[in-house]
């Protein structure tokens, strides 16, 4: 599987914030998107997963010679956790499992993977900020999508949870998954190398594509 972005431009509030942005990632690889606040990291991720239309350019996901709809192949984890506070943790994850299809881990195993075993009966709104984020990470595990698009995924996590999520990302890559992550802090993926010696993690600095810098 291969994801290509070609000559993308994105706008916010009617003003172009980045342009001439291109990249390619393949199976088992990750792209870490960095840059100052307001540089367009979140806008780029929303364009890639189809939540926003690009001002220019295109995004294409292919498997062999077949074009695959990005929306059908990706998990998107944004700033918001996208969970109903009044529903239990289990009910929220069950909704997303059925909505996304492609069952992977069962809910209990997914919660155990984020060190939240035993909370599935609790209302989501009862959880702490860090626990809520970990439930949202568990959402990535209860149904299989090859492409993870995650925006500041470690927000609200402690160091132990950050390390646990880094290992989950590495495992996803080992299973031929792809990851695009926007972040302002290290995600613990630096230095990942394939068996052939190729770097599996690339970085993209949004500052290099800002309209001011290009002008």
Swiss-Prot record:
Subunit comment: The complex is composed of two ATP-binding proteins (CcmA) and two transmembrane proteins (CcmB).
Membrane topology: Peripheral membrane protein
Enzymatic class: translocase
Family according to the record: Belongs to the ABC transporter superfamily. CcmA exporter (TC 3.A.1.107) family.
Lineage, uppermost ranks: Bacteria, Pseudomonadati, Pseudomonadota, Alphaproteobacteria, Hyphomicrobiales
Known function: Part of the ABC transporter complex CcmAB involved in the biogenesis of c-type cytochromes; once thought to export heme, this seems not to be the case, but its exact role is uncertain. Responsible for energy coupling to the transport system.
Pfam families: ABC_tran
Name of the protein in its database record: Cytochrome c biogenesis ATP-binding export protein CcmA
């Amino acid at each position: 599987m291969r994801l290509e972005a070609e000559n993308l431009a994105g706008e916010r509030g009617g003003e172009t914030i980045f342009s001439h942005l291109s990249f390619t990632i393949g199976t088992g690889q990750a792209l870490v998107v960095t840059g100052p606040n307001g540089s367009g990291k979140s806008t780029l991720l929303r364009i890639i997963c189809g939540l926003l239309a690009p001002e220019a350019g295109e995004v294409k996901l292919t498997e062999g010679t077949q074009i695959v709809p990005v929306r059908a192949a990706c998990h998107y984890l944004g700033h918001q956790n996208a969970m109903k506070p009044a529903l239990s943790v289990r009910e929220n994850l069950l909704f997303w499992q059925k909505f996304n299809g492609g069952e992977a881990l069962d809910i209990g195993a997914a919660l155990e993977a984020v060190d939240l075993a035993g909370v599935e009966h609790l209302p989501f709104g009862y959880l702490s900020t860090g626990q809520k984020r970990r439930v949202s990470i568990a959402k990535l595990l209860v149904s299989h999508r090859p492409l993870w698009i995650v925006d500041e995924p470690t927000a609200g996590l402690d160091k132990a949870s950050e390390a646990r999520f880094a290992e989950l990302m590495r495992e996803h890559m080992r299973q031929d998954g792809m990851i695009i992550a926007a972040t302002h802090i290290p995600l613990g993926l630096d230095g990942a190398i394939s068996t052939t010696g190729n770097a599996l993690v690339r970085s993209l600095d949004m500052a290099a594509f800002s309209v001011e810098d290009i002008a």
